[in-house]
């Protein structure tokens, strides 16, 4: 999820190119693109859903809130050199309000992983030599990236926040860290999905479903480890 031109599609391409052996876009509605991935012969349906960009349309915002609250993990993409965060803040408030409703207080919210994308475009533009140690930045670029991360952390209060560059034109930054964060969040995502099914009265045997989901997690983890 994210504003128009935040780089969501580029992020999806980077992730599915690294973590999946086969990828195909499934038919979908409301401008969302659903990606079906296969890892080690196991079909992972709806592993990634690329939502329409935030553009101030309240109807779009409502649909995105519905998708977020029915997701296991949310990747929220921000354009690093764009300081306007009104649309993102409004969406975050709408998501929080959903879980504050009495009818939804037993629901487990998915973890939100905010990605400050396109950090290579932050000043100074003539410097780009990743990786950058943001805990103790030694260059002006590193300091600006650290400031951008802190600014967006205060705006959106995510569970996890990472600076990122997935461009094909310059050296990438933090893609491996993002993959590790997704793998680490998998168990929480499984619990979020099982909670959602339980609250909604899903008749599926949740014990068996939990076993299936954890097995898929093992497959993803092995696929990730192969890249190290």
Residue ranges and their predicted role:
Residues 28, 54-60, 142-145:
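A conditional alpha-helix N-cap/helix-loop micro-motif detector
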Residues 1-49, 55:
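Conserved G1/Walker A P-loop phosphate-binding module
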Residues 39-43, 63-156:
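Conserved C-terminal guanine-recognition region of P-loop GTPase G domains, centered on the G4
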Residues 107, 113, 119-228:
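C-terminal end of P-loop GTPase domains and the immediately downstream helical coupling element
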Residues 25-27, 51-53, 81, 164-168:
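A short hydrophobic beta-strand->loop->alpha-helix junction that borders the nucleotide-binding pocket
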Residues 47, 51, 59, 131-133:
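Conserved ASCE/P-loop NTPase catalytic core
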Residues 58-61, 88-89, 172-176:
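Conserved strand-to-helix beginnings and helix N-cap segments that scaffold or border functional pockets
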Residues 11, 75, 178:
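Residue-level signature of catalytic and energy-coupling elements of molecular machines
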